[in-house]
Amino acid sequence: MNYFITGGSGFIGTHLTNLLKERFPHCHIYNLDIVENSQEGKVTYIYCDVRKPIHLEEVTVTEDDVIFNFAAVHRTPGHSDHEYFETNILGAENVTAFAEKYGIRRIVFTSSIAPYGAAENLKEEITVPTPNTPYGISKLVAEKIHTIWQAKNSSERQLTIVRPGVVFGKGENGNFTRLYWGLRGRKFMYPGRKDTVKACIYVKELVCFMLYRLEHHEQGVELYNCTFEPAYTIEQIVATMNKVTGLNRTAPLIPAWILMPAAAVIGCLGAPMGICPARVRKLMGSTNICGKKLADSGYHFHYTFEEAIADWFKDNDNQYLK
């Protein structure tokens, strides 16, 4: 059996590769990406731009193979609008066309919680999506493209769509990493509030759940929010990081009425800090995502939130989170 991972050079793809090789040492993994990464010989790298049709002339592809579609433009804000649509929508079209061409019957698609839109209310899988960013819109359209592919042969095709919260772990270089180093350098301050809900999932848990669904989902379309249940507040996340890593940092709170004008001024000055009103609003807003469906799916979590942070810390020789 072959596993094709689009965007396999990235954070989630790297962890999935490690898990696949751990469970299936003799499997063949193909990393389809524009960034070369053979992951120490664990995968076969093939240059692939998902914005263009996918042709694999030298690989024997069978209907029993599996596609993990991770390729995406996702940092928001950070890209021009057309980049989200170009990569995420054309990518979905070309990946599903590749599956169609070779008769591949199973796809796992990593979407996002962005299709829910920005709002404080709890979002379940049955919540009507109301995306309010180009990224969120492009991801919702990409979900529909994958769903159409499945519907063309619904009795045989298996599609799992996951909407992860903030994914953290070794190599993420994202929100949790910045939070840790901000705490460590005494530069982190709560933006506007301490009760902001930040739904999240450990990367090792996410890839384990993906394989679990492959084994327990025969056909049809399924959609899962992927987050710890219940989701944690930023204050709880900070407290856990402090406890596990021994930082014991106290973070002050900056009121929103101070923070927003300051962000506007800093943004106008073009400071290389990534600070602007849009990013500050994102920091202050909750990602209040319900993980109950995942919790009730029969899947057993390998880590509590605290254990996940501790495992990540251990992966960095108990020195830091990175």
Where are the regions a protein language model picked out?
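Conserved C-terminal active-site "lid" loop/helix of NAD(P)H-dependent oxidoreductases
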Residues: S38, V203, A239, A262-H300
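Catalytic helix-loop patch of NAD(P)-dependent Rossmann-fold dehydrogenases
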Residues: E86, L90, E120-V167, P191
